[in-house]
Amino acid sequence: MASSVGNVADSTEPTKRMLSFQGLAELAHREYQAGDFEAAERHCMQLWRQEPDNTGVLLLLSSIHFQCRRLDRSAHFSTLAIKQNPLLAEAYSNLGNVYKERGQLQEAIEHYRHALRLKPDFIDGYINLAAALVAAGDMEGAVQAYVSALQYNPDLYCVRSDLGNLLKALGRLEEAKACYLKAIETQPNFAVAWSNLGCVFNAQGEIWLAIHHFEKAVTLDPNFLDAYINLGNVLKEARIFDRAVAAYLRALSLSPNHAVVHGNLACVYYEQGLIDLAIDTYRRAIELQPHFPDAYCNLANALKEKGSVAEAEDCYNTALRLCPTHADSLNNLANIKREQGNIEEAVRLYRKALEVFPEFAAAHSNLASVLQQQGKLQEALMHYKEAIRISPTFADAYSNMGNTLKEMQDVQGALQCYTRAIQINPAFADAHSNLASIHKDSGNIPEAIASYRTALKLKPDFPDAYCNLAHCLQIVCDWTDYDERMKKLVSIVAEQLEKNRLPSVHPHHSMLYPLSHGFRKAIAERHGNLCLDKINVLHKPPYEHPKDLKLSDGRLRVGYVSSDFGNHPTSHLMQSIPGMHNPDKFEVFCYALSPDDGTNFRVKVMAEANHFIDLSQIPCNGKAADRIHQDGIHILVNMNGYTKGARNELFALRPAPIQAMWLGYPGTSGALFMDYIITDQETSPAEVAEQYSEKLAYMPHTFFIGDHANMFPHLKKKAVIDFKSNGHIYDNRIVLNGIDLKAFLDSLPDVKIVKMKCPDGGDNPDSSNTALNMPVIPMNTIAEAVIEMINRGQIQITINGFSISNGLATTQINNKAATGEEVPRTIIVTTRSQYGLPEDAIVYCNFNQLYKIDPSTLQMWANILKRVPNSVLWLLRFPAVGEPNIQQYAQNMGLPQNRIIFSPVAPKEEHVRRGQLADVCLDTPLCNGHTTGMDVLWAGTPMVTMPGETLASRVAASQLTCLGCLELIAKSRQEYEDIAVKLGTDLEYLKKIRGKVWKQRISSPLFNTKQYTMELERLYLQMWEHYAAGNKPDHMIKPVEVTESA
């Protein structure tokens, strides 16, 4: 404000009066500078009365009235000065100040510019003009005003610092930095410039330089409040919490009632884990500034951390009452609603937060997470990408986007996201765990184990990582601290169930651990409830279902839902069933949840079902369920359960009146939306019905089925070469199989038929005997040619016009035959030598994945091998990294390494066929061989099992019961060992049991898909009749034997 009283008008008064006027003018000026405006005005009025035309006095009066907010009086005296001297630039500038204060910015700017035209070197005019231009939004004009002032006086370090502030606000950080540096060069002790320069470095991410400059500012000016606050803020962001606290406390010593500083200090306490102290400090900030939404929001965060969720919710709501557009409170309140299960309200709040603040990265990420939970994967992906666009170093968003991409089957995209999250934040435990899961699903178990362990080092209390690590260790048979691991895993599940959290153990893995039946059922139930949560957001009204078959011309419509219509064990088991249903009474729909894999398995189901619908092309669960309902399905069959590719949300929507679990999942769904589980008396005894959420629906023999007779008919017959027999004919040293086997044998001379006695069924293998005819090729030139082909690794030879192929070369001869899609057309030779198996030993085998082996199972096997000296155990490298662990534990149990032989995993046809080479299969009691059990039994190899308490541990007993081989089912560990030892030491007994299995696989119902389909139809009709009569689902444990097609 121009207020000079210099250059007063000339006077003819005596010298004494002149001095008196001059002295009074100087006194008034000093009083003005000191802020004593009342005294300054009083003395100026004396001067004005003495000299009413003195422009210096008029300017000072204008300035005094301006400072006292008497704008009209200020304008009056400026106008008087202009009347006295129309060229007085300071008067125009003072008048501009009045206009600016009144908000009349254009008038103010015009007066400042007029002042500068009158006096081009008028520094205050430039400064005032710059301020007005900033207020008017003309930033570039303001910059030019400051530059003009500095051209006249380059040493104005305050003006240069102000110019730096303006440039910083414009984002021109390098130019701002140059201004601050020049100001410091001009005045090294100018604390404000040091602090401002610290702000620039902070904005540029140069944290340590920012800290240095803020510390320099407070050193120069120990009472510089803003510098202490800035220092505290940057130390807080750098997570140097102790020094941040010290800076904030110093600021509070300068300004004890500074609410924002109290709030920032509380944030540091919160980050330090001093939750109670943080809460108290937030409350102090609110006490000082009751209308402080940030403090309420942060207080709520601390209260939530302490577990006071209801109080936290109140605080978020208070913050929103104070500021309905407080984005952080909207976002954080949404988090609470989400945790409470109020998903729709959470979505509404997240969307509101984004309306208020579209560039809110955390809200985008949180909304995306909920959308992913609802199955809206594309929309979720869009919001994750927005979050990352806004915040390119947002590690959480990268990690969560990886989860979405993983669910969308984009494994490479997920891998890139997790890797990027870890690059941004190497200490991000969740990202390490997610990366581990990708490795786990890809079969890279060692990498998965390493990543899970890294996650647990970073975050020791991490149930998901611990339980997944436990599963990985189970996969590779790493039993280090096994008992302790199992105890901890059980305690984790117990705590999670008690707190109503989603358990970290997957339902499909629960059978591997010593969990109670109640826990296993509860784990499945939680996953079933997740499906309900996903479909509830669709707000679909319940479907209306028919009570009769009028609309389907009296036929029962059955819908099979699976992601495994293709090259998958489930299709290997049931692919013929859709085409075997009675077309007069059943209409079959197959709903594929996965795209066409191009295999014959898919083609067969597509061709033989009445209707085949690819639901993978309808990703929306609501629309897919609509399609099922429109098809008028009466019984909808869930063949996935909680296995990969499942869409249980379809069943949660209940598009069919009856919904049943069948075949593909070895356990209960735990879901209210599944009515029945198709099982049998051996697998699911009625006395354990409480283990299931579904009602038990019994098949008369076994619920399990295999399509082996259709896929592998060439294994119905076999011939052997009499190789090193020493008078004893073995049926599993060198074996020939083929569709044309009989014709080939007829072309050979000297083929002998050896009669193999075998029990004729029943519990007692010695009760009665029948003979099986086994062709034996003697050692002659033909046999020698076959053996030479094997020894030399030849792919195929021709004998008497028949193609004889090496059993290891089926993939090279016919890949579709190797996968089981076609029946091999050649005679295939399978030998023990191909797999490094001893010719003269008893070969026990197990072809399951290694995760089904536990320490107690390996101990039983070791005991058996010790009791049968000339014996070996044949396992698969499934996975290969498990082999050294098994070998090490076996050696610790006293077994030499050569007693366990490992082979690689083989294509399906070879896998089934080579099972003939083993003498006995030793089943895994923890989780039986299900499909592999059927495979080995079709190969004619006896399987010893010991049923446990879970469905998964009783399937083999069900298969053997159906086969009529009860003598192979043990009731205890000791009996299991004794059965296996008797088979390994009593060769006549072994021969009889092998003959029985070889015969019964053809004559029993186990592999009879036509009979099985008829029995299944009868069960479906029971379900329908029960429903049509108006009854709720109930156990169906007295199935009717089928004598003719239902």
Swiss-Prot record:
Quick one: which pathway? Protein modification; protein glycosylation
The entry annotates sugar attachment on 3-4, 399
Tell me the active site. 508 (proton acceptor)
Where in the cell? Answer: Cytoplasm; Nucleus; Cell membrane; Mitochondrion membrane
Its chief place of residence is: cytoplasm
UniProt catalytic activity: L-seryl-[protein] + UDP-N-acetyl-alpha-D-glucosamine = 3-O-(N-acetyl-beta-D-glucosaminyl)-L-seryl-[protein] + UDP + H(+); L-threonyl-[protein] + UDP-N-acetyl-alpha-D-glucosamine = 3-O-(N-acetyl-beta-D-glucosaminyl)-L-threonyl-[protein] + UDP + H(+)
Give the modified residues of type N-acetylalanine.
2
Could you say which residues bind UDP here? Answer: 849, 852, 906-908, 911-914, 930-932, 935
Induction comment: Expression in the liver oscillates in a circadian manner.
Catalytic class of the enzyme: transferase
Residues in a coiled coil are none
Q: Which GO terms describe its cellular component?
A: cell projection; cytoplasm; cytosol; glutamatergic synapse; histone acetyltransferase complex; mitochondrial membrane; NSL complex; nucleus
GO BP annotation list: apoptotic process; cellular response to glucose stimulus; chromatin organization; circadian regulation of gene expression; hemopoiesis; mitophagy; negative regulation of cell migration; negative regulation of non-canonical inflammasome complex assembly
EC no. given is 2.4.1.255
**Positions carrying Phosphoserine:** 3-4, 20
GO MF annotations in UniProt:
catalytic activity; chromatin DNA binding; N-acetyltransferase activity; phosphatidylinositol-3,4,5-trisphosphate binding; protein O-acetylglucosaminyltransferase activity
**Stretch list, region Required for phosphatidylinositol 3,4,5-triphosphate binding:** 991-1010
Activity regulation (record text): Subject to product inhibition by UDP.
The record's function comment reads:
Catalyzes the transfer of a single N-acetylglucosamine from UDP-GlcNAc to a serine or threonine residue in cytoplasmic and nuclear proteins resulting in their modification with a beta-linked N-acetylglucosamine (O-GlcNAc). Glycosylates a large and diverse number of proteins including histone H2B, AKT1, AMPK, ATG4B, CAPRIN1, EZH2, FNIP1, GSDMD, KRT7, LMNA, LMNB1, LMNB2, RPTOR, HOXA1, PFKL, KMT2E/MLL5, MAPT/TAU, TET2, RBL2, RET, NOD2 and HCFC1. Can regulate their cellular processes via cross-talk between glycosylation and phosphorylation or by affecting proteolytic processing.
Q: How does it assemble?
A: Monomer; may exist in different oligomerization states in cells. Homotrimer, oligomerizes via TPR repeats 6 and 7. Trimerization is not necessary for activity in vitro, however it increases affinity for UDP-GlcNAc. Component of a THAP1/THAP3-HCFC1-OGT complex. Component of the NSL complex at least composed of MOF/KAT8, KANSL1, KANSL2, KANSL3, MCRS1, PHF20, OGT1/OGT, WDR5 and HCFC1. Found in a complex with KIF5B, RHOT1, RHOT2 and TRAK1. Found in a complex composed of at least SINHCAF, SIN3A, HDAC1, SAP30, RBBP4, OGT and TET1.
Can you say what this protein is called? UDP-N-acetylglucosamine--peptide N-acetylglucosaminyltransferase 110 kDa subunit
Report the source organism: Mus musculus (Mouse)
